[in-house]
């Protein structure tokens, strides 16, 4: 509120100060103040005062007390004037001010006349102005209140207006009176002036006038101020009223309003009184003498009420001045006035002071009032707030009370519920206890019942067994008596037959010498020759059935007859004595010759030498066996091929994997241009053995050739190659012996071929290969269908209506038994179609407008249901081609897999990662894998549907954003590397040494595991570190004697992977005690252990150390019944190791011997004289070394000794062929030392291989020197031969080249091959390759066997025997010690020989078999399948007994031995049980077991080795041959590391009888064909690679792995041979697929599934003599599988039928045909590795390596190729960037651009998607395809394989 001017209290006239007396008395009408005109200022003053007094609406007086109505007043003239209301008055507050200013002159005169002071007037004017302001404010407040519609306020305003009107009337009257008085005064003043113009009077009048004017102006100003103050007060009043109205309550301030009203009225009355006084004074002053009048005037002025009487008096006074006074009176009057004026001035001053005091007091009171009002307002607000809170509090209290009541009730309910719950819980627990008790009682009861039943059954079985035993004993007695009589009666006839066979052997020897010359000429083309030789070697080894085959290991069935083995004629294990005998004779006839290094490279020459060596067949039996072998050259040759592979024949091709990058120009060598630059992870074809400098002769995937440092590469084991076999093959491999043999041979070939082709397994044929799966990566788990289930393609909408759709699709291109289709809509089955229904469907009741619908078609086949997402289509409103549900399916630190739901499965999808284009996802592929990612990195993946260049486009499809979906993901952070697997502690190569082996972790091309770089491995003993190996690929380490003390105190060892970021977790601990016990035991000869039966021992003795198992051919055919069965042999062998664990070689020897026993008889003699034996021998030597190192026992007692023992008598170790200087003990020691040295050297190499080949070579040289210095220097004996055969280089095996081990092995191999060696072994190129490797070990097979089948050799042979062991029970069972020794020897060889194999197999550092001792069966399988060392390329986990793992992560035994061996080793214990292991090896179960237990090497063996195992069966001798051939063709390469295309044994392939032949013969002849076929077959084996054209184009000797080249062998006329029924596993066109020049004329073309007539067994080249379409000719064994027909009627029906459906090929049905799938079932080729080391794991387990992305710019001319196998990069690819590879199914036609890259991959396109395609999974389109020359494409795809073989 604004402060109001303080006014004198009511009834205090003296309180008014002189300044408050306005000059209103001087205002006259003449000045504009007419009667009735209320001066604005005067009117405003009372109004202001009134408003000030009435600050609030309340008043003590009634509303009408002050203003009963409009005030009517009568002016002096009698006119009644109605005063304006307050509202009107306030509208012109400034009117008085302007009016007064207009009358300044008159006011001045009036004031001059009055003489009133300036100061009081100014102050009064100022006070009036303030009042005016207050009035204005009040007016505004009034208006505001009026607007606010406050009725009380409006009423008060009306009252105030009335009061103001009354005051205005009073003021008007006062103004009029003042004017009248003024006029009177002026009239009175004018009268005297005229008569008396006194200058003084004039001056006074002027001064008064001026003073009055000033007073008037001041008074006007004061009035204006008062008006303003009044207005302000009004506004404030209104505000207060509004505020009070808001509060809603009246406060005590209304008491003050009455006071204000009273003060206002008093002030008004005082103003009027003052005005009257002024007027009277003015009247009196002019009249000086009239004092009486002056006194009257004041009295009248003092009248309290301004009434008419007062006005009358004033009028009288006004008229009184008319009296004229005299001069003296004037002066007196003037004086009186002056004195009075002085008094008035003083009085005025006192009044002013009093007014100021009053004003101050008033201000103070106003301040107090304001404070009181503010406080009151605050209290009112506080009160209202507190009242609200009190109300709320009451409400809350009431609610609280109510809630408390509810809470109490709820609490009670809860308590009761808890009590009930507790009671129920207790009851439940009791019931549970009762139930549990009852359950246990029931289980116990059931268990007791089961135990009772079992016990009852067991009792019955025991009783039955007792009866059977009794019967068997009686029958045995009778049979024995009959046999004795029969033998006596037939002795003469047999002698005559022996002489006849000897003659045949001599003739055959001559023929083989010619072949040797031819092969020598072909050595310039080592591939084909190697195939032939290795095939021959493999055949010799592989043909257990042909007992006389020198090349073959001990043959269970000797030439004596089927009696030797109980296997059916068609079974793999069975060999026909006739055929084997001729073959053996032939082999025997061939003189042995030492091979130069080039010769060692040439398997053919080796085989030639084997055949030429008369020693190889020392006995007529051997000659007979050679004759038989002649008939079964294929199988025989196949077997030797594997050993040769081990020996490392020059021409033999192996697949190696570059473990490190190598730039020759940065090395220390003088001729870097002669060396090949290497990139870590790329595949290399290695030809022959390692030279003395530690270099291989190799070829890159792009065709460049040169020297390859051995310590920079590691051999790709057969297991690795076979690990990529198709699932069907894998399954089949486990299913039966024949199948297994097929896998080992054909499969091995396939896998090896696959490896060779680029480390990438080749896809199956179109039927199985669906390109989709390869697009970027295999389908994620749960996504996509199994590879075997075809799916429909190209779904389209034929017609779309409002609520229905007509769909159509294409049937799966694969041959499959369709059982119908399911149509899904949005994942729900909408319609099911039965079989035979057209691929169309009408979907009705579809709401196409509601939104997009996802329609998919699923094929129901005999293989299962296809993946619906592979044939799907989005339709309906909003449907498009954009992929949906893009998500991360699998995420790791370095890889990620994405999946999506394709909008249209017919379209390919481009995949981008961080904006970079990746290989596209082919049509029907909805996943992609990104590899080589950085850990913990954010990536953005984009999948964009690719619109076809031609075809209907929907609007908007041209915009990429409408066709793409994006996804962001962050890779997991890098962690510690993975721990190594399969840690084992095994006896070292010599006493006092323990070998700790493990399976190295899988690393990518950059050498990283789990995102961190692997630097090596640390070995811990009971948690304490004892050793570190600074090699990321090391697979084993030898613990020296100094460290042995530490180990003796510990119980277990663990291995950790080292990296810059720390070490991995501990591996699974391996116990140390057994290894320590064995290592600490002195080496004993297993030969000393109980000897096998004489027959068995004889075969073993027949085995020559150089030959390995090849030299083991049994001199005397051991009939099944007669000879210890493989089981018995295994039993003996197992006994051997148990009794004398230190005799590892004996075990292997036993195995080998047993194996050889059967094959010795058929191939021994020829083998002795030939390189084939040597290759086998090296391999056996390696195995023997392994055994020796493992057992540190009578390793010297080689299988050869065992064979010798078996041959001549029951002596456990008969060194008939070995030099007399080498005694059993010296041989044992030598073998032990050899094994030790070999192992050490190999181990060292493995260690050093990480860094430089030079170091490794140096170490190897040192080791070699050490070996040479050893007391028993096996090297020396073998060195000459091995060097001579291998080419002056003691490189029996690539793995043994530079190492002393290698030299020793070479020397061993150089030792004269025993008669066990079979020429046939070398007839097959693949075998030749293996033989070459073996030659590297003991290439002078003939010489080594002839020189002295030293126990070391026998140990090697034992290894070979192991590999041959599987051949048949007929194998001479090694004594338990022998078997154990062989096992250990195998282990040692696995280490040593394995390394040798590795080296021979082109993996110098790795000991293929080292990781796990290899069974004789393994060796056999390896020898057969891999041709020896080839399998060693990859590290293999220890086999059954856990032989020394590959030191450098390579598998010693398996790779060198080939897959076959690993497979065998899995199934059969490596050494301990000679007979039993042999039997088991021979049996499919054994094979299966081997596969199961083998690591990748084993798996390879399983694929290839299994075939060997099966080939181990003596029945046909073909099993061996087949296995070898199968391998040799491919396996030869496998042996070399690239033999993915090994040919499977005939029986493995489904040709039971082919075994003997398939192993040997097939390898031999097939080498070209087998090579072709094997390669193709290897592909076939691995997945329809069978008709590998490239193989076919390859030289017979081994150039091609497809069809083995045929060696000119004498074959009996087909009319005289038994008729067999075979089925074609692949399409075969001799003209385009065969490497043989006369293929078009001599070989038969056929189609897959075609039924073929086959006469007898396959020849040494791996070819059958058959008939098709009325035409007779040769049929490559690896392209067909035998159909087991039980009855002649069924056979006739089958022949009439002419074809078998694909699904029947792998099935056997009662009397119907039973196909031993060799090519259909084979697993896919080995996993293709791109610049990455492949580990021995299943393809699915291998971590894919980063595939190289190929951009369109790099595309070259395109050509179609056919997928031979199903390929799923996620499952089959070891590379990290599997998304860059295309998944496909067998049979898909893939367009390939340009040439194969260094890693063996093509850049191809399938279904609109592009990516990398492993070459070893492809084959050229068949003749029906009309595309490329079948040979061309296959040759291209299997280029690596062929290279191995060819080169």
UniProtKB/Swiss-Prot annotation:
Q: In which tissues is it expressed?
A: Specifically expressed in brain. High expression level in the limbic system such as the nucleus accumbens, septum, and hippocampus, as well as on the cerebellum and pineal gland. Abundant in the CA1 region of the hippocampus.
One annotated GO molecular function:
voltage-gated calcium channel activity involved in regulation of presynaptic cytosolic calcium levels
Q: Where is the composition biased (Basic and acidic residues)?
A: 1203-1215, 1412-1421, 1546-1578
- Keyword set, alphabetical order: Cytoplasm, Mitochondrion, Repeat, SH3 domain
Q: State the InterPro entries in the record.
A: FN3_dom, FN3_sf, Ig-like_fold, RIM-BP_SH3_2, RIM-BP_SH3_3, RIMBP1/2/3, SH3-like_dom_sf, SH3_domain
Question: Where are the residues of the annotated region Disordered?
Answer: 57-81, 282-318, 560-626, 728-787, 1107-1174, 1191-1215, 1240-1307, 1322-1478, 1514-1616, 1701-1747, 1818-1847
Tell me the protein family, please.
Answer: Belongs to the RIMBP family.
> What name appears for this protein in its UniProt entry?
Peripheral-type benzodiazepine receptor-associated protein 1
């Amino acid at each position: 509120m604004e402060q109001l001017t303080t006014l004198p209290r009511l009834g205090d006239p003296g309180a008014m100060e002189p300044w408050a007396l306005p000059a209103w008395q001087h205002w006259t009408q003449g000045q504009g103040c007419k009667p009735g005109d209320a001066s604005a200022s005067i009117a405003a003053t009372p109004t202001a005062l009134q408003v000030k007094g009435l600050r609030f609406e309340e008043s003590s007086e009634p509303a009408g007390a002050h203003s009963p109505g409009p005030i009517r007043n009568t002016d002096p003239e009698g006119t009644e004037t109605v005063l304006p209301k307050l509202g009107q008055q306030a509208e012109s507050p400034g009117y008085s001010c302007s009016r007064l200013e207009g009358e300044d002159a008159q006011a001045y005169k009036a004031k001059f006349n009055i003489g009133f002071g300036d100061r009081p007037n100014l102050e009064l004017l100022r006070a009036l102005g303030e009042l005016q302001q207050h009035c204005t404010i009040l007016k505004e407040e009034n208006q505001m209140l009026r607007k606010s519609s406050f009725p009380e306020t409006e009423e008060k305003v009306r009252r105030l207006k009335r009061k103001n009107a009354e005051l205005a009337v009073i003021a008007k009257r006062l103004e009029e009176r003042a004017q009248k008085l003024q006029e009177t005064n002026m009239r009175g003043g004018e009268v005297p002036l005229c008569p008396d113009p006194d200058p003084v009077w004039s001056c006074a009048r002027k001064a008064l006038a001026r003073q009055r004017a000033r007073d008037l102006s001041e008074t006007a100003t004061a009035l204006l101020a008062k008006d303003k103050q009044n207005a302000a007060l009004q506004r404030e009043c209104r505000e207060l009223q509004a505020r009070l109205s808001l509060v809603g309550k009246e406060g005590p301030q209304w008491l003050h309003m009455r006071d204000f009203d009273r003060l206002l009225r008093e002030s008004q009355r005082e103003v009027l009184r003052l005005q009257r006084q002024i007027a009277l004074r003015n009247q009196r002053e002019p009249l000086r003498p009239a004092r009486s009048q002056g006194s009257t005037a004041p009295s009248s002025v003092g009248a309290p009420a301004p009434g008419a009487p007062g006005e009358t008096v004033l009028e009288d006074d006004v008229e009184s001045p008319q009296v004229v006074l005299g001069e003296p009176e004037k002066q007196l009057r003037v004086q009186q006035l002056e004195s009075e004026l002085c008094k008035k001035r003083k009085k005025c001053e006192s009044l002013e002071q009093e007014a100021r005091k009053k004003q101050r007091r008033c201000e103070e009171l106003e301040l107090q009032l304001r404070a009181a009002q503010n406080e009151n307002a605050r209290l009112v607000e506080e009160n209202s707030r507190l009242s609200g809170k009190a109300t709320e509090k009451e409400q809350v209290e009431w609610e609280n009370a109510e809630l408390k009541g509810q809470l109490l009730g709820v609490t009670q309910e809860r308590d009761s519920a808890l009590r009930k719950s507790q009671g129920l819980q207790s009851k439940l627990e009791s019931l549970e206890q009762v139930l549990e008790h009852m359950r246990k009682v029931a289980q116990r009861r059931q268990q007791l019942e089961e135990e009772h039943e079992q016990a009852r059954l067991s009792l019955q079985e025991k009783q039955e067994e007792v009866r059977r035993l009794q019967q068997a004993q009686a029958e045995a007695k009778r049979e024995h008596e009959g046999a004795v009589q029969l033998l006596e009666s037939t002795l003469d006839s047999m002698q005559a037959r022996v002489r006849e066979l000897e003659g045949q052997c001599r003739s055959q020897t001559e023929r083989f010498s010619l072949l040797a010359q031819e092969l020598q000429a072909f050595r310039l083309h080592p591939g084909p020759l190697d195939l032939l030789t290795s095939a021959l070697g493999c055949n010799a080894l592989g043909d257990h059935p042909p007992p006389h085959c020198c090349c073959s290991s001990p043959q269970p069935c000797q030439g004596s007859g089927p009696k030797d083995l109980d296997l059916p004629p068609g079974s793999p294990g069975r060999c026909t004595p006739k055929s084997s005998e001729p073959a053996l004779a032939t082999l025997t006839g061939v003189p042995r010759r030492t091979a130069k290094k080039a010769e060692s490279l040439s398997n053919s020459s080796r085989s030639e030498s084997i055949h030429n060596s008369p020693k190889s067949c020392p006995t007529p039996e051997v000659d007979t066996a050679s004759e038989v072998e002649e008939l079964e050259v294929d199988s025989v040759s196949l077997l030797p091929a594997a050993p040769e592979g081990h020996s490392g024949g020059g021409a033999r091709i192996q697949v190696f994997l570059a473990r490190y990058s190598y730039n020759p120009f940065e090395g220390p060598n003088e001729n870097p241009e002669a060396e090949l630059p290497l990139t870590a992870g790329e595949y290399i074809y290695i030809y022959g053995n390692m030279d003395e400098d530690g270099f291989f002769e190799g070829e890159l995937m792009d065709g460049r050739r040169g020297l390859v440092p051995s310590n920079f590469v590691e051999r790709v084991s057969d297991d690795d190659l076979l690990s990529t076999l198709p699932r069907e093959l894998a399954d089949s491999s486990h299913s039966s012996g024949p199948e297994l043999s097929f896998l080992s041979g054909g499969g091995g070939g396939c896998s090896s071929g696959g490896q060779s082709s680029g480390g990438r397994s080749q896809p199956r044929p179109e039927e199985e290969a669906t390109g989709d799966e390869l697009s970027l990566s295999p389908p994620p788990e749960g996504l996509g269908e199994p590879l075997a289930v075809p799916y429909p393609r190209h779904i389209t909408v034929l017609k779309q209506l409002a609520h229905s759709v007509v769909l159509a699709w294409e049937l799966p291109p694969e041959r499959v038994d369709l059982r119908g289709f399911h149509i899904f809509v949005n994942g729900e089955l909408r319609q099911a179609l039965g079989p035979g229904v057209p691929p169309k469907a009408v979907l009705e009741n579809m709401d196409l407008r509601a939104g997009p619908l996802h329609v998919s078609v699923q094929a129901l086949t005999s293989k299962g249901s296809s993946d619906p997402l592979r044939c799907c289509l989005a339709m309906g409103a909003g449907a498009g081609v954009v992929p949906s549900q893009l998500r991360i399916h699998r995420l790791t630190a370095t890889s990620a897999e994405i999946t999506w739901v394709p909008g249209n499965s017919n379209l390919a999808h481009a995949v981008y990662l961080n904006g970079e284009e990746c290989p596209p996802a082919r049509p029907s592929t909805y996943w992609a894998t990104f590899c080589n990612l950085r850990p913990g990195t954010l990536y953005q993946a984009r999948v964009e549907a690719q619109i076809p260049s031609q075809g209907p486009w929907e609007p908007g499809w041209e915009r990429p954003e409408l066709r793409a979906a994006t996804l962001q993901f962050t890779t997991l952070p890098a962690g510690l590397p993975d721990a190594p697997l399969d840690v084992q502690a095994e006896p070292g190569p010599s006493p006092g040494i323990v070998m700790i082996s493990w399976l190295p972790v899988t690393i990518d091309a950059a050498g990283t595991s789990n995102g961190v770089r692997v630097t090596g491995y640390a070995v811990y003993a009971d948690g304490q570190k004892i050793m570190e190996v600074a090699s990321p690929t090391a697979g084993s380490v030898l613990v020296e004697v100094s460290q042995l003390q530490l180990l003796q105190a510990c119980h277990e060892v663990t291995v950790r992977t080292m990296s810059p970021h720390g070490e991995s977790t501990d591996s699974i601990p391996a116990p140390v005690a057994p290894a320590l016990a064995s290592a600490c035991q002195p080496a004993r000869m297993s030969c000393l252990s109980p000897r096998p039966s004489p027959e068995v021992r004889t075969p073993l003795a027949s085995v020559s150390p150089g030959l390995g198992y090849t030299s083991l051919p049994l001199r005397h055919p051991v009939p099944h019944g007669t000879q210890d069965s493989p089981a018995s042999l295994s039993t003996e062998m197992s006994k051997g190791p148990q009794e004398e664990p230190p005799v590892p070689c004996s075990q292997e020897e036993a195995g080998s011997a047993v194996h050889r026993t059967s094959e010795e008889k058929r191939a021994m003699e020829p083998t002795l004289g030939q390189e084939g034996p040597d290759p086998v021998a090296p391999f056996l030597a390696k195995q023997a070394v392994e055994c020796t190192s493992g057992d540190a026992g009578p390793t010297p007692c080689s299988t050869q000794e065992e064979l010798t023992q078996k041959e001549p008598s029951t002596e456990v170790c008969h060194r008939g062929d070995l030099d007399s200087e080498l005694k059993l003990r010296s041989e044992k020691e030598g073998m032990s030392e050899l094994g030790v040295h070999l192992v050490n050297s190999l181990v060292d190499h493995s260690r050093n291989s990480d860094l430089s080949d030079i170091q490794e070579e140096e170490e190897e040289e040192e080791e070699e020197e050490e070996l040479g210095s050893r007391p028993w220097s096996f090297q020396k004996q073998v060195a000459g031969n091995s060097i001579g055969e291998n080419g002056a280089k003691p490189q029996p095996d690539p793995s043994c080249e530079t190492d002393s081990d290698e030299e020793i092995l070479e020397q061993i191999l150089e030792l004269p091959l025993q008669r066990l060696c079979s020429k046939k072994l070398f007839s097959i190129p693949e075998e030749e390759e293996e033989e070459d490797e073996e030659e590297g070990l003991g290439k002078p097979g003939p010489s080594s066997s002839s020189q002295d089948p030293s126990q070391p050799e026998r140990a090697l042979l034992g290894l070979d025997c192991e590999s041959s062991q599987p051949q048949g029970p007929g194998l001479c069972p090694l004594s338990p010690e022998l078997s154990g020794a062989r096992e250990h020897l195998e282990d040692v060889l696995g280490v040593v020989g394995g390394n040798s194999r590795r080296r021979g197999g082109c993996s110098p550092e790795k000991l293929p078999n080292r990781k796990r001792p290899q069974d004789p069966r393994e060796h056999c399988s390896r020898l057969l399948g891999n041709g020896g060392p080839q399998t060693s390329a990859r590290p293999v986990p220890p086999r059954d007994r856990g032989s020394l793992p590959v030191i450098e992560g390579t598998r010693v035994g398996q790779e060198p031995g080939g897959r076959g061996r690993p497979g065998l080793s899995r199934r059969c214990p490596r050494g301990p049980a000679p007979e039993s292991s042999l039997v088991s090896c021979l049996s499919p179960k054994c094979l299966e077991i081997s596969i199961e237990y083998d690591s990748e090497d084993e798996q390879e063996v399983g694929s290839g080795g299994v075939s060997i195992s099966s080939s181990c069966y003596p029945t046909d001798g073909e099993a061996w041959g087949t296995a070898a051939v199968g391998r040799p063709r491919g396996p030869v390469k496998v042996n070399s590391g690239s033999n993915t295309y090994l040919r499977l044994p005939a029986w493995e392939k489904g040709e039971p009888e082919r075994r003997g032949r398939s192993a040997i013969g097939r390898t031999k002849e097939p080498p070209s064909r087998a090579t072709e076929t094997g390669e193709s077959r290897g592909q076939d084996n691995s997945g329809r690679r069978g008709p590998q054209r490239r193989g076919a184009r390859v030289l017979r000797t081994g150039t091609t792995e497809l069809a083995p080249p045929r060696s000119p062998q004498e074959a009996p006329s087909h009319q005289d041979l038994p008729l067999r029924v075979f089925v074609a596993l692949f399409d075969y066109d001799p003209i385009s697929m065969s490497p043989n020049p006369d293929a078009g004329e001599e070989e038969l073309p056929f189609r897959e599934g075609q039924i073929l007539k086959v006469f007898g067994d396959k020849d040494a080249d791996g070819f059958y003599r058959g008939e098709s379409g009325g035409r007779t000719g040769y049929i490559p064994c690896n392209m067909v599988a035998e159909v087991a027909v039980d009855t002649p009627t069924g056979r006739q029906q089958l022949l009439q039928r002419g074809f078998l459906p694909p699904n029947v090929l792998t099935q056997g049905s009662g009397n119907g045909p039973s196909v031993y799938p060799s090519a259909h079932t084979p697993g896919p080729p080995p996993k293709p590795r791109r610049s990455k080391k492949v580990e021995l794991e299943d393809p699915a387990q291998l971590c894919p390596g980063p595939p190289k992305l190929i951009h369109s710019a790099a595309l070259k001319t395109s050509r179609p190729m056919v997928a031979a196998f199903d390929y799923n990069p996620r499952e089959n690819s070891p590379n990290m960037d599997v998304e860059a590879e295309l998944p496909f199914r067998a049979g898909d036609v893939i367009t390939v651009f340009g040439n194969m890259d260094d890693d063996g991959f093509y850049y191809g396109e399938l279904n609109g998607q592009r990516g990398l395609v492993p070459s070893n999974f492809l084959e050229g389109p068949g003749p029906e395809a009309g595309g490329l020359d079948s040979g061309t494409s296959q040759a291209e795809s299997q280029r690596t394989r062929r290279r191995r073989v060819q080169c």
